[in-house]
Amino acid sequence: MKVDLRKVPAVYMNLKQHTEKNEQMQSLLKQCGFETIIRVEGPYRPENPPAGCAGAHYVGVCEIDPPFVLFEDDCQLHNFKPVIEVPDNADAVYLGTSQWARYWQFSGPFVHYEKYNDEIVRVYNMLGGHSILYLTQDYVRMCQRICHHHSEIIGYNQDPGFAEVQKYFNIYSMNDPFFKQSGYNEAVTTCKVTDVGIHISDAQRFFDSVKYDLARLQGVPDLNRAPSTYHPLRIV
């Protein structure tokens, strides 16, 4: 399935006080050639920014029916291509990627992938959410539920919830990301998934190597030398 991203609505999340980021996103999206640009504003929660982030994603995924691309306002250009060929069964495609993933209640550089072609991989547990192409209503509805639960019930970012359900959907990612995050996360959002991830052919071996020694999942460094961490989230 060929997708001209310029003809897909671009929705970006931005708080009204972040005027500089608003200007940067308008400039970036116009530079990419997006024909429809929509700004949405999530809840301002200075006492709990992760919950605010999840709330913003909730507003974003409820704004319009798919297809649409949802952006966080710290996005920057990396290797953007306006026209892509994606699998016909895709529920979503991550245009911005991350080395980080969820694995057995740990967050760290454990992203599992399967190569579709040189440009696209299927992902099973990837964290991050700075640029995602949403394609099917079924998946959007799931993400709406996750965002609401994370924002209103447990008060945390939505991307662990996204990562934990990816294996139930057909979620793909650009191997070489189109967009990156600025600042500290730049290194882990500009790498190729195939350079840093765990291919599914190696998933069983990796699982067997840690299942009776979960301490091996603690302190694994990413490209920034930031360590993986045990980070369980409460249910309610």
Regions from the PLM with identified roles:
Residues 1-71, 75-236:
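An acidic/histidine-cluster motif and surrounding catalytic segment
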